[in-house]
Amino acid sequence: MRKALKFIGAVTGALVVLLALGLWYLSSRVTVRGPVLHAIAGIGGAEATTDSVSGLRLAPGFTLDVYARNLGPARVLRFTPAGDLLVSVTRAGKVLLLERDADGDGRADAVRPLLEGLDRPHGIDLADGWLYIAETGAVRRVRFDATTRTVSGTPQRVASLPGGGMHFTRTLRVGPDGALYVAAGSSCNVCIETTPRAAMLRIEPATGAVTSHAEGLRNTVGFDWQPGSGDLYGVDN
């Protein structure tokens, strides 16, 4: 019996080591790896370099280079009215501010934390002097001055969101009607949801009232409105 237990323990240990080595190998060798490895172990790929991006094929007239380094596993990007770039780093719990390229060298002039200590922030957007942040369990907002590149006060809770489960990121956009639209992915692959999940939620910024805008979406990571028609298009993962 003891020999059998030792054998099972040895085999299990070997499998764990092989899995760890496999994940490490994939993280540095395989091109299409990000979402799977990020979900399993929080592993991203190697940092992009000028050489690594030079092999990507682009449409005629486009060029590609590294704009900023050492950001961590960045997720959502949003430009400010001043031309700076806000970046959510979900697993680090922060939002970064990348100062616009004023000197024309093709790089962000500076990178600094704008907000820290957040609960897995993902979606970010700006409207009426507010920076809106979609955490995994809530939408918050904080006053943001694009000219001085500063926030004031502490983030206020606008509305609560269903948290936990497999899809924990929440994508947020301010809609053409001024309401907040938040994608809350399903809690698992095959679920009968008891909370508003696998759905697009509409939130009134002034009151925090939450209604369901669309359902049966699984996990809409990116979405936007078509100019002119106002139709809403989303990409599910």
Regions found by a protein language model. Give the residues of each.
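Beta-propeller domains with acidic blade repeats across secreted/periplasmic ectodomains
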Residues: 17-237
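N-terminal Sec-pathway targeting helices
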Residues: 1-18
